[in-house]
């Protein structure tokens, strides 16, 4: 069962959202502050977080950044603020989606399901390329006898590239396939993830390489 963390300092909203998500077979955990949410995550795992922006103490923007950077969690921001600048700041903070109050819980549910589909792991899929094996079930990169569990986005990016070796993927395609078509953040996030992957592959002495094709994008090739 999917487990959703809901963070809002309005207890009525916590109860309202939790009640409806539970009815849709989504397990929920509610926290009334960003600080308590981080404390909970120190010893517990969830699949997705729904975060209110306007909270006392740690606000939703700061919490979203922590959830993305430290836990690589999918996040949907929930707020009464509809200004374009707020939406922009939300996406810069790393949110996967944005819902404005008042809202229909069905809409929130649809968005949760859509975001989770982008993060979904198919346990049947294994890719072997050169001396590299990628196992989706565990988000595991294996090079010879060395195993590394990758962050979700890094794994999804490498899995996509390795699934079609020599195929050139544009930045736009990679962003749409991994972050979603409605992603409004900086496209340079692709470059950051590629740099990290290259470093990992180099350290593990992998026989695959992520190449930059000038003016086009990225592809994976193998070295014998």
UniProtKB/Swiss-Prot annotation:
Keyword annotations of the record: Activator, Cytoplasm, DNA-binding, Phosphoprotein, Transcription, Transcription regulation, Two-component regulatory system, Virulence
Keyword hit for Ribonucleoprotein: no
Protein's cellular compartments: Cytoplasm
Any one of the GO CC terms: cytosol
One Pfam assignment: Response_reg
Molecular function via GO: phosphorelay response regulator activity; transcription cis-regulatory region binding
Protein name: Heme response regulator HssR
CDD domains reported for this sequence: REC_OmpR, trans_reg_C
Signal peptide start and end residues: none
Example GO BP: regulation of DNA-templated transcription
Reported modifications of this chain: Phosphorylated by HssS.
InterPro entries registered for this protein in UniProt: CheY-like_superfamily, OmpR/PhoB-type_DNA-bd, Sig_transdc_resp-reg_receiver, WalR-like, WH-like_DNA-bd_sf
